[in-house]
Amino acid sequence: SEGNNYYKYTFNDVTKINMMFVTNGKQSAELTRNTGEWWYKNKRWSSKNPEDMQEFDRVDMREDTIYFVITTRFYDGDTGNNVHCWDDSQANNPDSDPAWRGDFKGLIDKLDYIKALGFSAIWITPVVTNASGYDYHGYHAMDFSTVDVRYESDGATYQDLIDAAHEKGIKIVQDIVVNHSGNFGEATLAPMFKKEYDSIQDLASVDCMKVIEGSDFAKTFPNYDELDPGDQYAARLNIMKDTKELDSGNHDTENYYHHFKDLSWESPTVQTGQIAGDCVDINTENPKVADYLNEAYNNYINMGVDAFRLDTEKHVSRLTLNQYFFPSWLKTGGKNFFIFGEVCTRVSEFWNHNIPAISAPFYTWAESDSQYIDSFTNDQAANIDLTLKHYDSNATTANQPTSDNVYLDGLKYHTPDYSKSNGTSVIDFPMHWNFSNASNAFTRACQEDPYYNDASWNVTYVDSHDYGPDMNSRYDGGTQAWAENLDVLFTFRGIPCLYYGSELEFQKGVPMDVGPNAPLSTTGRAYFGDYLEGDVTATDFGTYTNASGAVASTLEAPLAVHIQQLNRIRRAVPALQKGQYTRSNTYVDGNMAFIRRYTQGATDSLACVTISGGATFQNLPNGKY
């Protein structure tokens, strides 16, 4: 024993070890570490003695602002793990710009840049092991329980990134997926392949994918390597979804995947069908599947992840999430762990085609109908049937709940009532889709707010890695319009989020994502690292010193300076973070004008805000302004 209940063991003459721990009969995931000194405590690795590390103080997420990066496209900290995707040649991505380029080392190196801009949380794309022709974004999982080796370096593991961010007061928001895996199977749900490679660069070829000997897949398709690509894809789905297209045997006997063949975007099949070729729909209503996914994702929470962004949330029934997933993650995460989901509704209205069951506000509520509370059983088929009934019960806007949690009572702040909340939030897609200009987005947000449990938790942005407000391109409205949009995001209710590079209007007007049909450098997912070369030291959120090289110029760009100012203002005014608001003409008159107030203990913060144009404020309480 060494120190406070620690045991020490030295492995001589090795550069890497793989190990597992068994505690009270429960086996950990396989753990891999390279040469060095490591501690393991409470399911977390550390390169420093945990007893010497200060626990990260996780605050209410509304106090934060979020900077969103595609990890592989942000900054290249270690050229040794750069690797092409299998389809890079089709996309014409050159050796100088492989799809897998940025990494955890790059994020660690540029934490001071993100903090200098003023952001206190970083949303990163999925970290789990992927497999597909174009998987640099992380949404095509092959193993939910492990981190993809293409992100990591010696001294820059995922744990190292989390710890380094926390040391600077920055949260890590992990993008996660439960709706689907990639189509090369999944290590637990459909084990068909393993990756064999001597160096990271070997992963640039599909030849690294080796059929697992003795697997059902190997026995069913012994000639897999001889099939043409179309039949290879059909063979993989035959095993995963039991399609019986190439073989009539029963393969997915545990029903780990949904077997539905049809999908319509505005019907219940949007939650049971396969949304894309590389997104094979997982049977989230199967308790065995839920147990596996919860164990995998709870392990990341135990590493110190501060929040989850749930991908493709609309494609999973709210009932399933409320029953199987949200309670588990919130319990593991503890105080101030935050979850927000992507309810992708590509319409300007807040009720998606007038169907609440696939609309953003709907996903912020707990179940209120007794027939759906604690209703799932071990029968996955019965659970699926219940989700279909749940969808039909919420297929019209009649009788949808409303809330005044985001509104002031006159000019008084009141304690929000979260008794009907499911404890999670969403990306404000209706607001996002209306950012053709700030006024439209602001108006839509005001119209939709009663239907969220509390819209002050909504994550708000102008554009992202998938869409701009016009659907296809990165925002191109000009610097002044960008500034006005940001003024709304940083002062109105919600948690502001900025997609990497927008501080420079990076790649403005170019197509956001075209798959492997053009070089990434011509899209909204281009590599940003050239603008980050040099050094900077963040002295606080939104302030810095010793900036040099390209990063100094980036931080001095007009929009970047504006963002720094907005972040400093928002951090200084609690009402702009967590306040309720009013637009009542008893107190305020103006196009985009409002009053926000937050009262808690000794804090009483009130802000009068006008975005652009004239405004008048009246009947305000006496105080120092």
Regions found by a protein language model. Give the residues of each.
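Glycan-association/targeting regions that enable binding to alpha-glucans and other polysaccharides
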Residues: 1-54, 58
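Extended extracellular/luminal ectodomain segments enriched in beta-structured repeat modules
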Residues: 14-17, 112, 603-605
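Structural recognition of the beta-strand scaffold that forms the well-ordered cores
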Residues: 21, 65-70, 120-126, 143-146, ...
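Acidic glycine-/aspartate-rich tracts in secreted/extracellular proteins
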Residues: 26-27, 73-75, 573-574
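Active-site-proximal helices and loops of the catalytic beta/alpha 8
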Residues: 39-40, 162, 166, 180, ...
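Short boundary motifs at domain starts and secondary-structure transition points
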Residues: 55-60, 271, 449-451, 598-600
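Substrate-binding/active-site clefts of carbohydrate-active enzymes
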Residues: 58-64, 72-303, 320-352, 358-432
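Active-site clefts of carbohydrate-active enzymes
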Residues: 278, 454-476
